[in-house]
Amino acid sequence: AMAVSHVIFKEFHYDHPDPYFTEYCRSPTDFPVLVMMEPREDGHFTAGRTVRACDLGYKAPECNNPEWKTVVWDELSDKPAVAQGSMGYRWGQKEGQDLGKWNLHEVDGETGKAIKPQLTFLKDSDAVIDVDYPYFGGRKRDGFPNNPMNSEVMVRKVPVGKIQVEAKDLYVATVFDLFGSYLGVDRGLGGECAKSYADNIPFTPAWQG
């Protein structure tokens, strides 16, 4: 399944983007949701939690459930937005607040403005960072083949944006960009990624085969 994901991402989201695939991933999935990148002492990063409305300054009771409303990057305004449809809009709906906002309409639920969630920072990133992912494929398990690598940590290049949270600059990545980097798809950023399907890099067809 991982190799299938690698091929689909490479061929239909990077090499030859398919409008149907792109629209589907951009609207009714969590691929555009922003994730905080947590710095490590060695200069690398790990994926932290999702960015929430409360990180943008929204507070209860003026904002209902701000800790449960996820954030995307809006292509139209070129800044973060609180897209409707996350769990924070499901509970405690009230007239004049969140009533009728638990849906996938492309609207910022807090401002009422139209938005277009951005899938990737690949073409307009503030930086490209090294992100560490755990690798478990080298461990021996009964009934399953293993494929040891040089390390149990995979380092991948990820394009990121920058936001301010409590007066601090933080790097954020979309779930889409994190997933693509995790799969080892070469998107022109360098680093440890597969140049072809024949490379023994997690998670290519050669690696899985």
Regions found by a protein language model. Name each.
Residues 1-208:
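Long, well-ordered, tryptophan-enriched scaffold segments
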